[in-house]
Design a protein with these regions (language model features):
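Boundary at the C-terminal end of the N-terminal hydrophobic targeting segment
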Residues: 17, 22-27
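Alpha-helical cap/lid subdomain in secreted, periplasmic
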Residues: 106-217, 221-226, 230-236
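Conserved catalytic region of serine esterases and O-acyltransferases that act on ester linkages
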Residues: 210, 221-265
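Conserved SGNH/GDSL esterase-like catalytic core that processes O-acyl groups on lipids
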Residues: 53-56, 62-135, 145
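A cross-taxon signal for low-complexity, glycine/charged-rich
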Residues: 23, 35, 41-45
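Positively charged n-region of N-terminal signal peptides that target proteins for export
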Residues: 1-4
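Bacterial N-terminal signal peptides
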Residues: 6-17
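N-terminal basic, low-structured, amphipathic or hydrophobic segments
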Residues: 30-31
Length: 265
């Protein structure tokens, strides 16, 4: 049996040899908002013509576990295309309705201008989840466009014990994107394809829901490629996340994930 190499995610001085544990911020109920302080707001003079894209992520633990926006930013730097400047408003278990009611996301949108605002909630494979996703996509979209941005939808995935829900999740996010003429970022579809093609590439973390480093790498490939419109075939398997942070995916796994990500639209 061939021994498998493990992905390594280093966030600052914290080494995670594998995915976030079940005691992550999501399970502890700790809200996360990356680059969402005054210094970030004061640094919003980036010029799109100078090769910058400003992206706001609104979501929950599917976004903040492994810090997806940070990985997307790292990919933009490694790729040599427009540099992404990302902010994140994300709280455990939040739907778009929760974000709308709390108000932080709406205020962050108003702090624009943005190029893209990426919306995400849970898999939304049920009728109720789909209704919430579509309804609040309709509510957020005018605010997003007023801020000079295009709405985008980060399609996520169901729990590992609910793989039958992939189709419902994909349909929900496609409908939301279609209704507001937004961009679809089909990470969930890429996950489904990857699991079918090579289930030995572990996308799920130990809780069977949140992503491993490989899962976050795949999701980030889809998000970065979808927003930048640049090819991702040569994206490095090792990324510098700034400071001491880094993400390292085994070369063989990274090759599989790049090919899968390039095949979804």
């Amino acid at each position: 049996m061939r021994a498998r190499l493990s992905a390594v995610l280093v966030a600052g001085s914290l080494l995670l040899a594998g995915p976030v544990s079940s005691q992550s911020a999501a399970e502890k109920g700790v809200p996360r908002s990356a680059r969402d302080d005054k210094s970030a707001r004061d640094d919003q003079s980036a010029d799109k013509s100078a090769g910058h894209l400003r992206v706001l992520f609104i979501g929950n633990s599917f976004t903040y576990v492994n810090d997806l926006p940070r990985i997307v930013t790292a990919m933009s730097r490694a790729d040599g295309g427009p540099t992404f400047e990302c902010r994140m408003v994300a709280f455990p278990g939040y739907s778009l309705e929760d974000h709308w009611r709390k108000g932080d996301a709406r205020r962050a949108i108003s702090d624009g201008p943005w190029d893209f605002v990426v919306l995400q909630q849970g898999p939304s494979s049920t009728d109720e989840g789909r209704e919430i996703l579509v309804e609040y996509a309709r509510r957020f979209a005018p605010l997003i466009r007023k801020a000079g941005a295009t709405p985008a939808f980060y399609m996520v995935w169901p729990a590992s014990v609910r793989t039958q829900d992939f189709t419902g999740a994909e349909e929900s996010y496609r409908q939301a994107a279609r209704v507001v003429q937004g961009i679809l970022l089909p990470a969930g579809e890429a996950w489904e394809r990857s699991l079918r093609r090579d289930p030995s590439v572990a996308l799920y973390g130990p809780d069977g829901l949140h992503p491993s480093p490989e899962g976050s790498y795949l999701a980030a490939l889809v998000v970065y490629g979808g927003l930048s419109k640049r090819p991702i075939a040569s994206m490095p398997a090792a990324l510098s996340l700034g400071g001491e942070g880094k993400l390292e995916i085994p070369d063989r796994d990274a090759a599989v994930l790049r090919e899968v990500a390039a095949g979804v639209k």
